[in-house]
């Protein structure tokens, strides 16, 4: 966005222009999302949207699909009009796309809104979101690829290809996603799911020994509700993550990136002191399938040589502890530190009691 003179344009304020620009940037936003980006009160946002719509600066349509789980009425979404884009351009905003360029099919709207919701949740924690248009253009990807965009973490050292999955996931869709992941340049992947069934479908497909996805970085599979919270304090935000680990009564001795010895075969997050023992600490709250894959090869002879157990941070949610124990049942030198997932919610201080599978 170019520097522009701060002034009123007709009956529109600078805040109104900025709101229109956010609609341009995100392509489509729900009423609740507009309240967030515009810092508007619950009731005032309706008044503001009605005002801008009556002036012809934006369009609204009903959301169809499964954007809001288990709810028949999905609400409305808004997008900027050609008149709105023209107004932004006249006032110094760098806007190259037309309203038709920004338009998204009704089928894809729930996916876009979900990605925007995740991006808005993570922005204050230092994450940066790039939508699918920008990613496909920058990395010369296929226009038909179904990745929703990318997320650059707070540490600025990982860029995740983002995939959004709803309650019903078809086998063909999973095969297509896996093909994209193997073909594209991203070494890190984040898949968010809605509902327990879709989570288990992704895990089963991605852990299939005949067609396993292997990347040099991370492949994280998380329920959407949990991802919005946990990623703000995960290892992708090192300072917050270390503080969270310390709150669990764990003393960090060394991070893997600064490890003094290359002998260990464990790719751990930290070397820690726990219950009077030195242990390799691995945070599996992120369900990183690459961490799990590597951990499966920390064999008995490696443990006997190193003399260190692995301390795995997990939770008592079904998408954590049971899954981890099932996959790692043959690795006997693991201590599981299971916490209530609401501890993550409390520490992150983002949302209260909600279904983390949503």
Task: Cite the ranges covered by each PLM segment.
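Nuclease-adjacent, charged terminal/linker segments that flank catalytic cores
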Residues: 1-108, 112-115, 121, 125, ...
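Electrostatic, structured charged patches in enzyme active sites and in nucleic-acid/phosphate-binding
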Residues: 110-358
């Amino acid at each position: 966005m170019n520097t522009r003179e701060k002034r009123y344009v007709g009956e529109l304020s600078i805040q109104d222009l900025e709101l229109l620009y956010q609609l341009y940037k995100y392509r489509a936003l729900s009423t609740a999302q507009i309240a967030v980006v515009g810092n508007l009160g619950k009731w005032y946002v309706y008044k503001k949207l009605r005002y801008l719509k009556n002036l012809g600066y934006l369009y609204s349509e009903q959301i169809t699909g499964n954007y809001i789980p288990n709810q028949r009425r999905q609400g409305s979404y808004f997008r900027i009009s050609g008149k709105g884009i023209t107004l932004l351009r006249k006032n110094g905003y760098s806007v190259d796309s037309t309203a038709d360029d920004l338009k998204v099919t009704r089928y894809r709207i729930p996916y876009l809104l979900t990605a925007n919701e995740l991006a808005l949740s993570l922005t204050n924690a230092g994450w940066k979101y790039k939508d699918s248009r920008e990613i496909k253009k920058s990395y010369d990807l296929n226009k038909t690829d179904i990745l929703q965009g990318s997320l650059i973490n707070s540490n600025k050292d990982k860029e995740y290809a983002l995939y959004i999955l709803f309650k019903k996931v078809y086998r063909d869709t999973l095969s297509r996603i896996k093909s994209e992941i193997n073909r594209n340049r991203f070494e890190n992947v984040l898949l968010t799911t809605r509902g327990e069934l879709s989570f288990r479908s992704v895990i089963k497909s991605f852990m299939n020994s005949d067609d396993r996805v292997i990347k040099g970085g991370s492949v994280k599979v998380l329920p959407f509700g949990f991802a919005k919270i946990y990623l703000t304090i995960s290892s992708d935000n090192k300072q917050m993550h270390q503080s969270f680990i310390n709150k669990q009564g764990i003393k960090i001795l060394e991070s893997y990136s600064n490890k003094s010895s290359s002998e260990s075969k464990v790719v751990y997050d930290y070397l820690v002191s726990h219950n009077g023992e030195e242990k390799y600490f691995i945070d599996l709250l992120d369900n990183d399938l690459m961490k799990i894959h590597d951990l499966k090869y920390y064999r008995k002879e490696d443990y006997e040589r190193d003399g260190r157990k692995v301390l795995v941070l997990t939770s008592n949610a079904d998408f954590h502890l049971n899954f981890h124990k099932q996959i790692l049942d043959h690795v006997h030198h693991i201590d599981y530190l299971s916490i209530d997932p609401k501890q993550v919610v409390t520490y992150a201080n983002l949302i209260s009691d909600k279904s983390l599978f949503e």
